[in-house]
Structure formats: C-alpha cells, structure tokens
Design a protein with these regions (language model features):
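Solvent-exposed, low-complexity segments and loops of surface/extracellular structural proteins
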Residues: 1-259
Length: 259
C-alpha cells in the first residue's frame, strides 16, 4: 500500500489491512489516500515493531497484530480523541511489547480512547508487557478474543504494567478473563468501573483513593497497603456459589465495602 493507491470504502464498516509492516519509520496515515475507511489493520514483519502516525481524518480504529515475535513495541501517535486501538495476540508463548498511545491534540479535558486486548482461544495466558497512555481522561478497556472463537476458562489476557498518567476513569468490559499483574500507575485515577465485565478480573489497584466496581466474574482484587477508609469497593453479583470474589490487603484504615 502506497500513497499512490486510492481506496474508497463507501457505506458500511470498511477495513484496510496491510502485512509486512516494518516500523523503523512511522507509517503516516496522512500519506495514504483513504476515504470512508473506518478501520486500519497492521501486521508487522516478523521481529519488527509497529509504528503508526495516525494524523489523518480516517480511519478512527486501528488493529495491530502480534506476529510470532516476543516483546516488540507498538507506537501509535497523533490519535484523535475517541479512537479505538485493538491489540491482537495470536501466537502462544509470545508477548506484545510496550504499547504507547498518544493524542494529536492533548488539550481536551474529557478525552477518551478505547483499547481492546484480544487473545486467541486455547492459548493460555496472552500477554501485553505494558500499555502507556497520556493526555487521555477516560480509558475504555475491553478484554476479548481474536476472531469468532471465544477464549476458554483457562485462558486469560494479561497486561503486566499500565501507566495512565492523566486518566481519571478506567472502564473495563469483556467476556475474556483479564489479569492486570502489577499495580496500575495513575496518580489522578479515581474510578475503575468493571461492573459490565463477565470474565474473571484479577486487578492490582493503583495507590490512590478509588471507587471500584467489578462484574459477575470470579474477581481477585489486590490492594497491598493502599486500601483505606476512603476506598469504595463493590465486587458485583456472582452467578453461582462457585464464582467467588476475593480481596487481599494490608489494612491501615478500613471503612465499609460491598462484595
């Protein structure tokens, strides 16, 4: 795909896909002649990084595919507020590396983006090393599956580290299990709402006062020494006695929590 190709998507939800991407130099979306294309899907060349400059009117959705390579970075800059980025992990035993997302215009006070983390059914733990987002106030994070075959109970999307420096709200949804290994870095984060999530959620909370809600899965919440009287926790309803939520913390101050 080059700047000389002209693609018009017309009506509907249209996707343009490329393979063999080598992100040594950023792919500039403004160089491409795409109209009415909603989604752009990129599969890297084996052992190469993904690097996209999203400064363009279209598309607003990006899909990146991990290509049999461990821990290669993904950088998408100049995103518009409201954009969606999907990270597809398709190979067992390989991880997506550090993912860094940034907006073109960071001046807004209520900017949101959506991040979809999708793993492959039957592959066990599918890992993203780290997600870094700045200049965004609301992160909508979804845990799902690649393709139409859902991840099974023994599978989980895993995000080792997360840094959301300006986010005040993190909304989590999805039917696939999700593990957040290390504490979320977010000094102004006040709300984590996973009440709509049906998969199991394992979360290590940020070291801030939180209003935290989880969904109908068997959720595991870890607070360490950060749980205080000001935290509000609602672990949601569970569909059976076999689906049990758990919370661990070294308690300094404790008020009322709901489980």
């Amino acid at each position: 795909l080059s700047k000389f190709d002209i693609i018009g998507g017309g009506d509907g939800d249209d996707t343009v896909s490329i393979t063999g991407h080598d992100g040594v130099t950023a792919l500039k979306m403004s160089d491409l002649q795409l109209t009415s294309v909603e989604t752009f899907k990129v599969t890297a060349t084996n052992n190469k990084v993904i690097n996209i400059n999203a400064d363009s009117a279209t598309p607003s959705n990006f899909i990146t595919v991990e290509n049999a390579t461990t821990a290669k970075t993904t950088d998408i800059t100049n995103l518009a507020a409201g954009s969606a980025v999907t990270l597809e992990n398709t190979v067992n035993g390989q991880t997506i590396g550090v993912v860094t997302l940034g907006l073109k215009d960071p001046s807004g006070s209520s900017d949101a983006i959506t991040i979809n983390v999708n793993g492959t059914s039957g592959q066990g733990a599918e890992t993203v090393d780290q997600i870094i987002v700045a200049d965004v106030e609301t992160i909508n994070l979804s845990s799902g599956s690649v393709g139409v075959t859902p991840m099974v109970a023994s599978d989980s999307n895993v995000i080792t580290d997360q840094s959301y420096s300006t986010a005040t709200a993190l909304n989590i949804t999805g039917a696939a299990n999700l593990t957040m290994s290390n504490a979320i870095v977010g000094t102004v984060l006040t709300t984590i709402d996973a009440s709509a999530m049906t998969g199991n959620l394992a979360l290590t909370a940020a070291a801030v006062v939180l209003d935290l809600k989880t969904g109908s899965g068997a959720d595991t919440l870890t607070f360490g020494t950060t749980l205080t009287v000001d935290d509000v926790i609602d672990a949601g309803s569970n569909p059976s006695v076999l689906s049990v939520d758990s919370l661990s913390a070294t308690i300094n101050e404790l008020g009322t929590s709901a489980a």
